[in-house]
Amino acid sequence: MSVWAIGDLQGCYDITQRLLEKINFDPAQDTLWFCGDLVNRGGQSLETLRLVHSLRAHSVVVLGNHDLSLLAIGARSEEEQRKVNPDLLRIVLAEDRDALLDWLRMQKLAHVDRALGWMMIHAGLAPKWTTQMAEKHAREVEQQLQGGGYRKLLRNMYGDQPGWSPGLIGYDRSRAIINLFTRMRYCTPRGRIATDDKGTPGTQAQGLYPWFEVPGRVERDLKIVCGHWSALGLTITQGVHAIDTGAVWGGKLTALQLDTDELRVVQVPGREVTGPAPVARAPRRPRERLGRQRSRGNRGNAGNTAVPAKPPVDTPQD
């Protein structure tokens, strides 16, 4: 029996099949851990979602930001749904859409196997969260997603604010938890996420750190595998194993074997793309008062905890 973690699929069905062939995946014996972002941008999101759904008895999935956006789209009106990009539109118009979306909504934000010694998340953890705290906060949001009021949560999850604080309540609390688990790359030592910084370490604004290198972070008792940050590439450091290697951007799709003493990495080439992958911005001037309310002339009400306007229906928050 083997346990494999697999990076962001993002609708790359053919590439996913090639990777499963390369690791000799045997559903009778093996288990797959999918790090989230199953859909969007790859052109075969419906096929990819159906594939992972068909493997549900032999796999574990954590939700990524693109998966949550798909759920939000599925909960909207038919008129709004028809405005999404063609890749996601095929899912919301599919005959089996309800089965697929209902199953996706039941997936986790964090998966823990203490016997194996691993935790899987999509993006990141707050600097002060132990693995036990992370599990607890993940369950809070999972219960909302899996309950009867999930549509309200999906309508209220968009926005960069507020930053995490243990005293948050309501949708502010849920939004902060979702952002940490599904959108995090860089943050301050206090855990304020910087959603505009997406490049490789060294390109971020002053005072920001990769979430797994923040000064003062807690020591964690499990190894962590995650995806989300394609610009980072395959990175193993500080007990964190980041395996989103940009398959959808022409990079590679990565599988990491978790049940061996020596980590085994298997990769296949990603999607052929006609244009360049997104490039990181050059380092910028230090931000002042990061995470606090900005002046009225800047980017709307960035410091207001009220729910911002929704982004376009086909634009997941990265």
From Swiss-Prot:
The protein's matches in SUPFAM superfamilies, at most eight in alphabetical order, are given as:
Metallo-dependent phosphatases (SSF56300)
Q: Where is this region: Disordered?
A: 269-318
Presence of keyword Hydrolase? yes
**Where is the sequence biased in composition, kind Pro residues?**
309-318
Q: List cystine links.
A: none
Q: Which CDD domains match?
A: MPP_ApaH (cd07422)
Q: Where is the composition biased (Basic residues)?
A: 282-297
Taxonomically, which superkingdom?
Bacteria
Reactions that this protein is recorded to catalyse? P(1),P(4)-bis(5'-adenosyl) tetraphosphate + H2O = 2 ADP + 2 H(+)
EC annotation?
3.6.1.41
UniProt keyword terms in alphabetical order? Hydrolase
Enzyme type, top EC level: hydrolase
**What InterPro entries does this protein's entry cite?**
ApaH (IPR004617), Calcineurin-like_PHP_ApaH (IPR004843), Metallo-depent_PP-like (IPR029052), Ser/Thr-sp_prot-phosphatase (IPR006186)
Q: Name one GO molecular function term.
A: bis(5'-nucleosyl)-tetraphosphatase (symmetrical) activity
Question: What is the similarity comment for this entry?
Answer: Belongs to the Ap4A hydrolase family.
Q: Name the job this protein performs.
A: Hydrolyzes diadenosine 5',5'''-P1,P4-tetraphosphate to yield ADP.
Q: Which PANTHER family match?
A: CYTOCHROME C5 (PTHR40942:SF4), PTHR40942
Q: Mind telling me what this protein is named?
A: Bis(5'-nucleosyl)-tetraphosphatase, symmetrical
- What is the originating organism of this protein? Xanthomonas oryzae pv. oryzae (strain PXO99A)
Q: What gene does the UniProt entry assign to this protein?
A: apaH
